[in-house]
Every structure is written in C-alpha cells, then in structure tokens.
Amino acid sequence: MRMWLGYTLALLAGLHGSNVEGTNEVEKTRKRFEKAFSCKLSDEEVEIIRKSLVEVSGLETRILLPLIFHDRKLVASPVAKYRDINEREREYVEKVVRLLPYLAWRSVALVCAPGNWTLFLMYDVFKTTSFKDFDPVVLYRESKGRSRMRLMDLVVEIFKRNNCMVSRFGQGLAREAEVRIQGISSSLSAMERKREEEMLRKIKEHGERLCTKKNQEQIIEAQKIMCDACEYIWKREENRKSFVMGAHLKHLYLRMIDPSNDVEGPLLYYIDHEKMINTYEKYKSISIVAELVKKVVIEYEDINDESISSAVHEVKERESEEKRREEESLRNAEELLRMEEREKGEGKGPNGKGKKKRGKKGAGKAKEESKEEDRGEEEEESVEAEVPVEEMAAEGARPKKKRSKERSKGEDSCYRVHKRVLRWMKSVERIKYELDNGKEEKWKGKSMEEIEGQKVLHDIIEVLKLLRSRECDKFFVRTGKYMKGGSERWKMVALGILDEGGEKKVGNVEVGLFKGKREESVVYHLMFKPTSSEKTGKGSSPSFGKGDDVDEIEEDGSSDMSGFQYPPGVRSEVVKDKGEFRIVWRNPKDTSSVLRSLAVLQIPEIQ
C-alpha cells in the first residue's frame, strides 16, 4: 500500500499541480482514496498521505515503461514500429507520442513540495525550451529502412533530447531552495524551522546532483537499459502475458483514482538508476536486469540487494534448466537416430534385401474392431452435460469428458476443490468457528466484521466455470511451479474488478493449485485480491510471485463437490460479454437487486 500511495500522490500532484498544503487537503485526499478503494485507510496510510502532501517527495529516480494501452488493449509494445500499429489506433498512439517529451521530462523533474514552487519550475523549464524542430510523431512515423524506429528507441531518443534541460532545472532548484532557506520565518518554532530547513536542503542537494554529468548520463543509461530489458521480456512469450497484465493492472488502478485523465500514457516506475546500472555492469546480463524489471512491474518489488540476489538466482536456475532440457533433447535425438540405423540393419537379409513381414491371421478383423472402439470412445468423450448456473460449482469441480483433441490440456481442464476454499461458501458464523478451530494461525481470532469482508473476496466459487472453459487461457496466466510444504504448487492469475454496492475495486483473481496424490489438480486458494488494500492481509504475497502464505495443505481435504447445491434463495448468474467474464450475485429476497459483481477481464489484447 505504501508504494502505491506514494506513487499515486506524486503522480496526481504532477498532473494537476494543485496546492496540497493544509489539513483540509489531507482529509480530501483521504476521502478520495477511501472511495476508490472502498475501504478505510489505516492511521499509518493517512500519515503517508500527510507527509506526501506537506513534505517534499519525488526525489527518487524513475523510468518510463515503453507500453501504450487504450481501452483494455495494448496498442503499442516496446518493439512496435509505426507501421506495426493497427490503423484504427494510430490516431490515439500519435496523441500519446506527442505527450512523450513532457512525460519523459516529468519522470526526471517531478518534485513535490509545499507551495508547488518545484512544479512551477518544472513547467517553466519545459515551456521555455524550444522543441520547434522536433516532432516525435514525425520521427516515429517517417523513419525508414532498417533504422525504422521502435517505440523503445523513440523513448530513449526523447530522453536524450530532454537532457539539455536537466542542468537548468537543477540549478533553478538549488538556487530557489537556498533563497527559501535564507528566508525562513523567525516566527516559526525551533522545531518547525529545523524541519523546513531540512526539507529545503534535501531539495538543494537534489538540484546539485542533477547538475552533474554523471547523474545526467545515468538518466539516459538507466532508461536505455530499461528499454532493452523490456525487449528481452517481450521476446520470451512465457513472460509477455504476465508483464502486460502487471502493467495493465496499474493502468486500471490509476484510472480509478483519476478517471478524468483520458490519455493512457506510458507508466512511471520508481527504480534506483544507480542500482540498475551497477547490476547490469556487474553481471553483463540483460536477462538479470529483465528479471528485476519483472519484479518491479509484476510483483511490485523495489530494486534492492535482496531483489537483485533473487533475480540472479532465478536466472541461473532457469538457464541451468534450459541447458538440461537442451542436452536431454540432444540425447533423445541421438538415441532415435541410432535406433533408426539399427532397424535399417535388421530389416535387411543376407543379400541386402529387406525381409517381408507377414500379417497375422485375423489381424484385419481386429483392426476393424479397434477402429469401431476408437469411434465409440470419441463419441463418448465428446459428450458434455449442460448444468444450471446454481449447480455450476459442482460441475466446475467434477472431471468431465473431454474431446480426444483436448487431451493435451487434461492436466488443468478439471479440478478438485480443497475444503479451505469451500468453507468461504458457508455462513459467517460457521466460517469463524472453523477458522478459530483450524490449523492456520493467521486466521484465528478474526472478528465477524473481518470475516464478512474476507467472505466477499473469497466466496467466488463461480470462477471455476471459467477455469474449466476453453477460454481459460484468454483470461488467466499460469505462473511457474514451485515446491512448498511437500507439494508441487502453481498459480493462475487474472485481472478483475469487484463492484460492491457501486464501489469498485481493481485487483487480481488468484487461483492457487497443487498436485494431489492421484496427480490431479486441486484448488486450495481462490480469492479476489484488491490492489493496495489492507483487506488482503499484511504481508500477503504478490499474485504473480512464486510462493504463498499457506504452509501446509491437507491433501485429503479436497472434494469433487458432487451433489452441491447453493443455499435456498441464493442466486448468481454468469455473463460473458466484450472480453470479460462477469459473475453477478443478487439479493435472495429481491433478485432484481444486485449485491455485488466480479468482472474477470480478458488479458489485454495485443494489437
């Protein structure tokens, strides 16, 4: 929550330049966030808002992510050239590209301080810099031959052009901060004067750093490395979906906070330039930096010693596994070649002629019977029972007949459901009883109010209908498998929007699975995890990360849910429309009244 609050506050200040001093502004901002998140902010979170509004923020280094979204579609990837962009989206992309010089400048110069004088200076430096000979749209559209510019190339070029403003801005910051230090009012208390001077000295030091050649080179180098890392990620299809989903989740979040912004420009991310550059120079590996970028975009991690060490370990582990598979594939190919050579040798008689194979008596008849059996099996396998929505959960958990062509997906096309998932379908009182008497310490002692809030997030068993459908892969991304508590586990993650009484939350739909004793897939975790909400529980793991907060799972605690029926009067319906799978829960006493709905969003279409 801390990272998201800080990021959004800085972004909103940079977009609107509003005066954010005073208790009233803290209260207004608190209400704005609570309305967007549909939850009460903690005292710690309110303090983050207060500090962000009345103290300096934005001194951290940032980068720009070379992706452009529009209406839940990715319309320009890092490697997209102008001709690659869908003609219907070109006008919108051009609109974003025209904003790139300012967006790139904001990523470098956005500093928020009481009175907004830092923002005014940022605007003034940008407006008084001549760009009359530079049109980013023309540069992007009219580059020719092999040198046709990709979006990532355009972003780096814009950062290079913007670099001429950095020294002037840094000098202005340092100079104005010194003037304000000298003019601190003597009417302030000693504590207030000290706090004011410390804040201004931080700004002055930041301005002086911006004037150094080393810092200016780092700005460009860090952005270039970032773009190269994005290109590396984009080339690996197994990373592409989760990368796009992680970025799109942030877009949805920001549009919920600030729906007035009609341009979905490239995202800003707080990344330590020096650590990123040092990591690249130390390991000479863009794959390690790409792993770090994935952690920032997908898992919301910062670049620090721990995340760097984790990235190095994961890349080495992946490369070792890839090498092992390549060697195994080579051995299999060599063995196959030797077998073919032996068969050729054995197939020749003393005169070098092949031996004639005789068929067995009755072989033709047996073959015909076998064909008839195969046809019968195929017909039987193609039968799929239609069930009412109220019994969907049972159908979703019970293995169903599959067409023979779909057997390759058999591992994930049917599921058993663990009792820790089923318990959330019960009454709040019963759930509390089971949690208080269960083995998971984190759930013990929860209040009825807390459990009621968690039930809203966890009681989404209807998602199983989507999991077992042929469209599942259009919505969910499968994460890598890992071992924990003696079981092989993995996750499936989708984007979602939960609407409860008109209050919307954006987040991830998480499905946790493990391999059961009979090699079946068992769902042991199912929930909607709102972005930036303490309702999910402190210390909860990121949706796309390996690992979870469930230590041990009782393997015999799963069910196929045969015979399950919803409690009397409860109604839910599933609607598929325009790239989303929507579950609607209605009031049992008045089915015209919607209690809540969950829209599972299709993975952003890549144009």
From Swiss-Prot:
Pfam families named in the record: DUF1609 (PF07753), DUF3654 (PF12376)
Disulphides: none
Compositionally biased spans, kind Basic and acidic residues: 313-347, 365-374
Biased composition (Acidic residues): 375-393, 549-558
Ranges annotated as biased composition (Basic residues): 353-364
Family membership: Belongs to the UPF0329 family.
Official protein name in the record: UPF0329 protein ECU06_1610
